[in-house]
């Protein structure tokens, strides 16, 4: 990925940070984009400390003007964008009857609507690239298998999978590829508060590898799907990195 530029939305977080490091170590220049200035700066410092070219831009993906500003600043800093990774996410643990419309709308605004608008803005730029571009949208195993207490999150992630495949179909002829990774259970900011002892036991019983994933274990799939060489004939692919969760019948 030498000479390529990747914008990582949600890049200051645990999963996004691992993806930023993985792509950077493969030679890409990284733009860390997240909602918090301090978190972005800390992530960039970590990346730079291991020799990765990295910069940052604060973004709120629920506001289109902020997304447009991210693209503008990224182009000013790097001259182009070859890869877009959508890794921002919001979750909340409630029973179905306790999901109110405000919570539902808030989760969908980040997980699906924000992702859709980000793809729109960046695809317009990628269409000007001679080599097109690659998009990686982070989904979830909950888009495929039901899980209690994450109803809005799961529904939004099912939308992410569908959106990704529609983008892939729409822009394949213009050399823009879109794929999705659906992680299994990776402890991160948005789900740690949901992982009580009983829930962890149930999840491990349903995961054949009987352990959580490490953020670094998403990197291989990301490199494959974003690579112009290794993933050149892959678009609309949904890759589950889940320790076997989606193939298990408990």
Describe each model-derived feature in a short phrase:
Residues 1-31:
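Canonical Rossmann dinucleotide-binding motif of NAD(H)/NADP(H)-dependent dehydrogenases/reductases
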Residues 124, 169-173, 232:
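Alpha-helical segment proximal to the catalytic Tyr-Lys
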Residues 176, 212-241, 246:
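C-terminal substrate-recognition "lid" of short-chain dehydrogenase/reductases
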């Amino acid at each position: 990925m030498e000479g390529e530029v990747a914008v990582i939305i949600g890049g200051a977080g645990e999963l996004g940070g691992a993806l930023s490091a993985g792509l950077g170590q493969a030679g890409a220049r990284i733009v860390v984009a997240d909602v918090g200035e301090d978190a972005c700066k800390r992530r960039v410092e970590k990346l730079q400390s291991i020799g990765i070219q990295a910069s940052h831009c604060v973004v709120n993906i629920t506001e289109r003007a902020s997304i447009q500003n991210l693209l503008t600043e990224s182009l000013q800093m790097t001259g182009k964008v070859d890869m877009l990774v959508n890794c921002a996410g919001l979750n909340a643990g409630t029973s179905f009857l306790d999901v109110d419309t405000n919570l539902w709308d808030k989760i969908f605004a980040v997980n699906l609507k924000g992702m859709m608008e980000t793809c729109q803005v960046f695809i317009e730029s990628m269409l000007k690239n001679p080599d097109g571009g690659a998009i990686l949208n982070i989904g979830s195993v909950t888009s495929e298998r039901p899980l209690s207490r994450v109803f809005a999150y799961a529904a939004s992630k099912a939308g992410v999978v569908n959106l990704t495949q529609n983008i892939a179909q729409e822009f394949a002829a213009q050399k823009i590829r879109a794929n999705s990774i659906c992680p299994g259970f990776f402890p991160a900011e948005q789900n740690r508060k949901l992982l009580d002892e009983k829930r962890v036991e149930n999840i491990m019983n349903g995961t054949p590898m009987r352990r959580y994933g490490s953020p670094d274990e998403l990197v291989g799939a990301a490199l494959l799907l974003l690579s112009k060489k290794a993933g050149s004939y892959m678009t609309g692919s949904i890759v589950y990195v889940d320790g076997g969760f989606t193939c298990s019948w408990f």
